[in-house]
C-alpha cells in the first residue's frame, strides 16, 4: 500500500485546522489512526528521559496522565535511541507500554508496534507510536512512507514547542536559534478549571507579584507554587518552603527571620531564617492563615520595606524575596473575624489563584489515576498497572473530599491489595480494590426497545445506508478507504451505494 498525495495532503490540512496545539495534535493522531488502520496511536513529547503523552486515539484515557520513563519501558527507550523507524516483531521480548491499555482488550497483549522518533534538527523532541492487535498489521507500509508521516508530525511538534518556549520566555522570534526544552513542574489535567489555572500561572509567573493560592486540602497548591517559580525569572535561584501550620509559636519568628547567637536559650550560633535563604528567589508560605497576628505584623513589614531583623539583632538585613502564600481557609472571612490582618491580606492577594477541587475537574481524575498507576508500577517493579472499566467508573463517581492526595493514596493502596490477590507482575485494579464510602454509581442504561415501523427490508437498507454514511465521513469520502473499513469490495460498495440512493 502506498500513501497517495491526497492522504498526505489530508494529514497536512488537519494539522492546520486546529485552533490550538492540543486540538491539532488530536486531529493528527485521529487521522493517522484512520489512514494507517491501526488500533491505537499516540503522540509523545520527550523530556528528561521520559515520554509525555500529548494526544492519543484508541487508548484508555488514563494514558494521557502517565509519564513513561525510559528506564521502565525498553521499547520506548529503543525508539529514543533510534534515528529511524523502529518495528517491533510480534514475538519481541520487550513489553509494550500500552499492553492492557486498549479499551475492551485489557487482558490482551499488543502485537504489532511501530515507533517513529521525532527530531528538531539533531534533538529528539518526541515520538509517534502505532499499535495493532494483528502481528503483520503495518507490513504494508514502507519505512519511507512512515518517515513522511514522522516528518509531518515532527514539524508540527517542533513548531508548537518553540512557540511555547517563546511565550514562556517572552522572547522575540529572532532571539531563538533553536528549541531548548524548558523543565517545568507537570500539572496534570485538561479540565476547563485546570486549563484556566495554567493560563493564569503563565501570566503571573513572568511578573514579580506576590500570589495567594487558595484551595481545599490536597488540591495541589504546592505544585502551583513550584510551577510559578519555575516559570519565573527567579527560577535559577532557590524556592524555599515553610509550612506555617507546623511552626510552634516559640520558634516561628526564628524560622522566618533567623536569630543571632545567644538570642534565646538554645541559640548557640547565628542562624539564617527562611527569608535569607530565599534571597533573590521565592519563599512559599504554606497555610499562611495559621500565623499569629504578631507574626503577621512582622511579615507585613518585610513585604512593605524588604528588610528583616534576626531575633536578638537590632540591625536590618535587606532581602529580595518573592512571596507565594497558600491557604485552605477563606481569608476574607478570617479578616472579618479578626484572625487575619486586612493589610497583609491585600499585600498577599495582589494576584489570587484558586485551585479547583478534584470533584470539579471531570475526567482529570482518570488522567491523575494513570499518573499514580505508573508511579506505583515503577516503585514496585511491576510490568504493568492498569485500571479496569469498573475501577474507572468508580473513580469518576466518587467526590474525593481529600482531593488529589486522597486519590494518590487510594491508588497506592489498591495496587498493594491487587498485587496480593494475584501472582505475577501484572496488576489490574478492580472496583473492589478501592474502599470508598457511600459511592452511588448510576444505574446501567437500558436501551429503549424501538417501535417497529418498517419491514425487514426497509430496516436493513436504513441500517446499511447509515453505516456507509458514517464510514464515508470517517474516511473523508474516500470510497476505497471506506471499503477497507467495511471489509468489502470497492466495486460492490459502489453498486450498493447506488441502490441505496447514496450515489447517482
Curated annotation (Swiss-Prot):
What's this chain's function? Required for the expression of anaerobic nitric oxide (NO) reductase, acts as a transcriptional activator for at least the norVW operon. Activation also requires sigma-54.
One biological-process term from Gene Ontology? Answer: phosphorelay signal transduction system
Protein name (record): Anaerobic nitric oxide reductase transcription regulator NorR
Q: In which residues is ATP bound?
A: 215-222, 278-287
Instruction: Indicate where the modification 4-aspartylphosphate is found in the sequence.
Output: 57
From the record, give the cysteines joined by S-S bonds. none
List, in alphabetical order, the Gene Ontology terms for molecular function in this entry: ATP binding; ATP hydrolysis activity; DNA binding; DNA-binding transcription factor activity
> Which residues does UniProt assign to DNA binding?
479-498
At the highest ranks, the source species' classification is: Bacteria, Pseudomonadati, Pseudomonadota, Gammaproteobacteria, Enterobacterales
Keyword Electron transport belongs to the record: no
Q: In which pathway does it act?
A: Nitrogen metabolism; nitric oxide reduction
Which regions span the lipid bilayer?
A: none
Record bears the keyword NADP? no
PROSITE patterns per record: SIGMA54_INTERACT_1, SIGMA54_INTERACT_2, SIGMA54_INTERACT_3, SIGMA54_INTERACT_4
Q: Where is the Sigma-54 factor interaction domain?
A: 187-416
Q: Which UniProt keywords apply?
A: ATP-binding, DNA-binding, Nucleotide-binding, Phosphoprotein, Transcription, Transcription regulation
Amino acid at each position: 500500500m502506498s500513501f497517495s498525495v491526497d492522504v498526505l495532503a489530508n494529514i497536512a490540512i488537519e494539522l492546520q485546522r486546529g485552533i490550538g496545539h492540543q486540538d491539532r495534535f488530536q486531529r493528527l493522531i485521529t487521522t493517522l489512526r484512520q489512514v494507517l488502520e491501526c488500533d491505537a496511536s499516540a503522540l509523545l513529547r520527550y523530556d528528561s528521559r521520559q515520554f509525555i503523552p500529548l494526544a492519543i486515539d484508541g487508548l484508555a484515557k488514563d494514558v494521557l496522565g502517565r509519564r513513561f520513563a525510559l528506564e521502565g519501558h525498553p521499547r520506548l527507550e529503543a525508539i529514543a535511541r533510534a534515528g529511524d523507524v523502529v518495528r517491533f516483531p510480534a514475538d519481541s521480548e520487550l513489553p509494550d507500554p500500552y499492553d492492557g491499555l486498549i479499551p475492551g482488550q485489557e487482558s490482551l497483549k499488543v502485537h504489532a508496534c511501530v515507533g517513529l522518533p521525532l527530531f528538531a534538527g539533531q534533538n529528539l523532541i518526541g515520538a509517534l507510536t502505532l499499535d495493532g492487535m494483528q502481528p503483520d498489521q503495518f507490513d504494508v507500509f514502507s519505512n519511507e512512507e512512515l518517515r513522511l508521516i514522522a516528518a509531518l508530525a515532527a514539524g508540527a511538534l517542533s513548531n508548537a514547542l518553540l512557540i511555547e518556549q517563546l511565550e514562556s520566555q517572552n522572547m522575540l522570534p529572532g532571539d531563538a536559534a533553536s528549541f531548548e526544552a524548558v523543565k517545568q513542574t507537570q500539572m496534570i489535567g485538561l479540565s476547563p478549571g485546570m486549563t484556566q489555572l495554567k493560563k493564569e500561572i503563565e501570566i503571573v509567573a513572568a511578573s514579580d507579584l506576590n500570589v495567594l493560592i487558595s484551595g481545599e486540602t490536597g488540591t495541589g497548591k504546592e505544585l502551583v507554587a513550584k510551577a510559578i517559580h519555575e516559570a519565573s525569572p527567579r527560577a535559577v535561584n532557590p524556592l524555599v518552603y515553610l509550612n506555617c501550620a507546623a511552626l510552634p509559636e516559640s520558634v516561628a519568628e526564628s524560622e522566618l527571620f533567623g536569630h543571632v547567637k545567644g538570642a534565646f536559650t538554645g541559640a548557640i550560633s547565628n542562624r539564617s531564617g527562611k527569608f535569607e535563604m530565599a534571597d533573590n528567589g521565592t519563599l512559599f508560605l504554606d497555610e499562611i492563615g495559621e500565623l499569629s497576628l504578631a507574626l503577621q505584623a512582622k511579615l507585613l513589614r518585610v513585604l512593605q520595606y524588604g528588610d528583616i531583623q534576626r531575633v536578638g539583632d537590632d540591625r536590618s538585613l535587606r532581602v529580595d524575596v518573592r512571596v507565594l502564600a497558600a491557604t485552605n481557609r477563606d481569608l476574607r472571612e478570617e479578616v472579618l473575624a479578626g484572625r487575619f490582618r486586612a493589610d497583609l491580606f491585600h499585600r498577599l492577594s495582589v494576584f489570587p489563584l484558586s485551585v479547583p477541587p478534584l470533584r470539579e475537574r471531570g475526567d482529570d481524575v482518570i488522567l491523575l489515576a494513570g499518573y499514580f498507576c505508573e508511579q506505583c508500577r515503577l516503585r514496585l517493579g511491576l510490568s504493568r498497572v492498569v485500571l479496569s472499566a469498573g475501577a474507572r467508573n468508580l473513580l469518576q463517581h466518587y467526590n474525593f473530599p481529600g482531593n488529589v492526595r486522597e486519590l494518590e493514596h487510594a491508588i497506592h493502596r489498591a495496587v498493594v491489595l491487587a498485587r496480593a490477590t494475584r501472582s505475577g507482575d501484572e496488576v489490574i485494579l478492580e472496583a473492589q480494590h478501592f474502599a470508598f464510602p457511600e459511592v452511588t454509581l448510576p444505574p446501567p442504561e437500558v436501551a429503549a426497545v424501538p417501535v417497529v415501523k418498517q419491514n425487514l427490508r426497509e430496516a436493513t437498507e436504513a441500517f446499511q445506508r447509515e453505516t456507509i454514511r458514517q464510514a464515508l465521513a470517517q474516511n473523508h469520502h474516500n470510497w476505497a478507504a471506506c471499503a477497507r473499513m467495511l471489509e468489502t469490495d470497492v466495486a460492490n460498495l459502489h453498486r450498493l451505494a447506488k441502490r441505496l440512493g447514496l450515489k447517482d
